[in-house]
Amino acid sequence: MYEVKLDAFNGPLDLLLHLIQKFEIDIYDIPMQALTEQYMQYVHAMKQLEINIASEYLVLASELLMIKSKMLLPQSTSDMDVDDDPREDLVGRLIEYQNYKEYTAILNDMKEERDFYFTKRPTDLSHLETDESWDPNHTIDLTELIVAYQRVKNRVELNTPKSVEIRKETFTIQQATEQVTSRLKDKDHFNFFSLFTFSEPIEQVVTHFLAILEMSKAGIINIEQQRNFEDINIIRGVNYHFG
């Protein structure tokens, strides 16, 4: 009998990742029967306790059962020559979600480290003026976004007095999200670096990055860069809406 633990999870992929880590499962070679049983026991437990189950949990349950069924089907000789693993799409989504969690944890650590320090000094931003021509078909990955964050962080820290501690004013991810959404209200894209004055508190810079990660993950925005190390553009995603 498997143990069912009713923890709070951020969606069905979070639950699956928890089960994979708990039972030390190889994410690239998932035993679908065991994992599906664990997942279904969790869903059944929620039903028995009359917990409201989000539809996305039930959708993934159906997907797991379908993958499990495909894995149990006998393969013909011709099928053996085809590299078509029914788990491939699920594994890709789990790895992408795991990467988001790791990057979010890194940025949260950076935010906590510098929560109480900031400087406010005028900065010449004329060198950040960019050509408005850009290729909307070129996307960037999280690694390039982290590099961009480090560039902003380094510029802020150059003018940060290390020995001065002040009482911070909390700047939330919700506020940062609203700022980005508002910027896209009348224009379908804007330059990423224009979000920063390089004189704001470092915690505000980190909060903006966390908000951008979450908005990108949710499809509210897309993050585009024409070539490596050039300026980054934030554009409206398929799930963008204002108000």
UniProtKB/Swiss-Prot annotation:
The gene is scpA. The keyword Cell division applies. Pfam families: SMC_ScpA. HAMAP family: ScpA. It comes from Staphylococcus aureus (strain NCTC 8325 / PS 47). This is Segregation and condensation protein A. Belongs to the ScpA family. Keywords: Cell cycle, Cell division, Chromosome partition, Cytoplasm. InterPro entries: ScpA, ScpA-like_C. It is found in: Cytoplasm. One of its GO terms (biological process) is cell division. Component of a cohesin-like complex composed of ScpA, ScpB and the Smc homodimer, in which ScpA and ScpB bind to the head domain of Smc. The presence of the three proteins is required for the association of the complex with DNA. Participates in chromosomal partition during cell division. May act via the formation of a condensin-like complex containing Smc and ScpB that pull DNA away from mid-cell into both cell halves. One of its GO terms (cellular component) is cytoplasm. Its main location: cytoplasm.
